[in-house]
Amino acid sequence: MIGKEVTLQDFTLELSELQPEVQPVDLFCEEELPAEHQETEEEPAIDRTPYKVVAPCGCCEVKLRIFVKATDFGIRTLQNLLIEELQLLCPECRGNCKHGGS
């Protein structure tokens, strides 16, 4: 390189040195793609069982019935909520309560 500015004549590319390392890649390889129906994994159907839940009203203690379809985990979670955190209200007691706890 002579001078302060670089010119293309100052660079010499030796592509023959890279030839052994660089190999062409066949883009049409022997890999087979699965069919579309095999490509999408179907989620297993969730097994839900119908249940009748009987719980007392949180105010007047009258028996209330609700019917749900739930998984084993879901029905156990509902049971824990009804025992510890949640109280159902009958229609009569609902009218006497203020919504939102205020």
UniProtKB/Swiss-Prot annotation:
Modification(s) after translation: Highly phosphorylated.
Cellular localization per UniProt: Host cytoplasm; Host nucleus
InterPro entries membership: Papilloma_E7
Chain positions covered by the region annotation E7 terminal domain: 1-49
Zn finger spans (unnamed): 57-93
Cellular compartments per GO CC: host cell cytoplasm; host cell nucleus
Residues spanned by motif LXCXE motif: 27-31
Transmembrane segments: none
Name of a matching Pfam family: E7
Primary location: host cell
BP-aspect Gene Ontology terms: DNA-templated transcription; symbiont-mediated perturbation of host cell cycle G1/S transition checkpoint; symbiont-mediated suppression of host innate immune response; symbiont-mediated suppression of host type I interferon-mediated signaling pathway
UniProt keywords, alphabetically: Activator, DNA-binding, Early protein, G1/S host cell cycle checkpoint dysregulation by virus, Host cytoplasm, Host nucleus, Host-virus interaction, Inhibition of host innate immune response by virus, Inhibition of host interferon signaling pathway by virus, Interferon antiviral system evasion, Metal-binding, Modulation of host cell cycle by virus, Oncogene, Transcription, Transcription regulation, Viral immunoevasion, Zinc, Zinc-finger
Motif stretch (Nuclear export signal): 75-83
A GO MF label: DNA-binding transcription factor activity
Gene3D superfamilies in the record: 3.30.160.330
Protein task: Plays a role in viral genome replication by driving entry of quiescent cells into the cell cycle. Stimulation of progression from G1 to S phase allows the virus to efficiently use the cellular DNA replicating machinery to achieve viral genome replication. E7 protein has both transforming and trans-activating activities. Induces the disassembly of the E2F1 transcription factor from RB1, with subsequent transcriptional activation of E2F1-regulated S-phase genes. Interferes with host histone deacetylation mediated by HDAC1 and HDAC2, leading to transcription activation.
Family the entry assigns: Belongs to the papillomaviridae E7 protein family.
Subunit structure: Homodimer. Homooligomer. Interacts with host RB1; this interaction induces dissociation of RB1-E2F1 complex thereby disrupting RB1 activity. Interacts with host EP300; this interaction represses EP300 transcriptional activity. Interacts with protein E2; this interaction inhibits E7 oncogenic activity. Interacts with host TMEM173/STING; this interaction impairs the ability of TMEM173/STING to sense cytosolic DNA and promote the production of type I interferon (IFN-alpha and IFN-beta).
Notes concerning its domains: The E7 terminal domain is an intrinsically disordered domain, whose flexibility and conformational transitions confer target adaptability to the oncoprotein. It allows adaptation to a variety of protein targets and exposes the PEST degradation sequence that regulates its turnover in the cell.
Protein name in the entry: Protein E7
